[in-house]
Amino acid sequence: MDIDQYMTDLGRRARQASRAMARASTAAKNAALAAVAEAIERDAASLKEANARDVAKAREKGHDAAFIDRLTLSDKALKTMVEGLRQVAALADPIGEISNLKYRPSGIQVGQMRVPLGVIGIIYESRPNVTIDAAALCLKSGNATILRGGSEALECNTALAKLIGEGLEAAGLPQDAVQVVATSDRAAVGKLITMTEYVDVIVPRGGKSLIERLMNEARVPMIKHLDGICHVYVDDRADLTKALTVCDNAKTHRYGTCNTMETLLVARGIAAEVLPPLGKLYRDKQVELRVDAAARAVLADAGVGPLGDATEEDWRTEYLAPVLAIKVVDDLDAAIEHINEYSSQHTDAIVTEDHDRAMRFLREVDSASVMVNASTRFADGFEFGLGAEIGISNDKLHARGPVGLEGLTSLKYVVLGHGEGRQ
């Protein structure tokens, strides 16, 4: 296969389809989503057969249990796919919405209209559910998409692509609006991220090595985040019960997510009160603690151990594991300084009963999501009321934070006149 020619052809067809999608009615888009949901329910058995072949090959290659779990398309996963499609169909359609319409002294009206981005390339690892999630959001937001999933999920993704195509056709929409890259050749990724004439944005969903490669090689703009080094700062005016709840959930709810707390900062004035119960809680849940000297003194005195020594590297590490770095800081100033130095600008939280300090934390911490008295685990499109998300961005341009339907759109200016000319 000539990868260059193959990817160019996908891009050309996606660009053409994007024009039809931009003018597609809400009813047609929702009909397509409903048809895909029905097709998945109808063909669940064949989808599971395709997935079983992918899983068997992955086992032969020696992939670990966690990888196999992400790859496996269970009955629950299929049900979630179907529910997700119907939830996206129920979301308000942002396309064509005009906002901020104002009369100018010249007599014209100036406003902004929400429009699709165009063609979105999604690069992700071996999670079949992402194929449906990404296709649904791109479809509803009036975009065309090129999906490049992990090679280990190729058979299942191909089967899903067929059902998506059938759903689009049934609704009178172009099948090329959702295309799956049907090759495991890594050169396809290299071509996709440089096709600026056909692809408007890339959304990568994967590990750090994938994101770093794309950051180095991509010519197409990206919506992405590299790390999730999230902090919780427990202020010396924190409510102890709230602090325990937030810090427990932020770390132990799920270890392998980008919005999990990786560093806990505690004000010196409350360390002796909050660290012992937290330390015992983490110890009971088998969380490895890497602490600075001040935290060690408090925890050791309370009989909490074993304790590792936190290094400079720990403040910069996204563990994605039951490991937590803990540092005692003098005050809010020191906490903000530490966070802005080491945070990946993803999600950071403060626990405090002091309104002024909370507002200052919100203003001065330079992250995509900043929280007061709430777990960092809430940094999620569904929890934010977006209905669904295609990913999370910690960049400052275009979308920032969880990226839902609006994050896959842009604004253009519209002018309504009555024959005016500029004086």
From Swiss-Prot:
Protein name: Gamma-glutamyl phosphate reductase
Annotated pathway: Amino-acid biosynthesis; L-proline biosynthesis; L-glutamate 5-semialdehyde from L-glutamate: step 2/2
Root EC class: oxidoreductase
Keywords tagged on the record: Amino-acid biosynthesis, Cytoplasm, NADP, Oxidoreductase, Proline biosynthesis
Role summary: Catalyzes the NADPH-dependent reduction of L-glutamate 5-phosphate into L-glutamate 5-semialdehyde and phosphate. The product spontaneously undergoes cyclization to form 1-pyrroline-5-carboxylate.
GO molecular function: glutamate-5-semialdehyde dehydrogenase activity; NADP binding
A GO CC term attached to the entry: cytoplasm
EC assignment: 1.2.1.41
Similarity annotation: Belongs to the gamma-glutamyl phosphate reductase family.
Catalysed reactions, semicolon-separated: L-glutamate 5-semialdehyde + phosphate + NADP(+) = L-glutamyl 5-phosphate + NADPH + H(+)
A GO biological-process term: L-proline biosynthetic process
Chief site of localization: cytoplasm
HAMAP family per the UniProt record, alphabetical: ProA
Cross-referenced CDD domains: ALDH_F18-19_ProA-GPR (cd07079)
Subcellular location: Cytoplasm
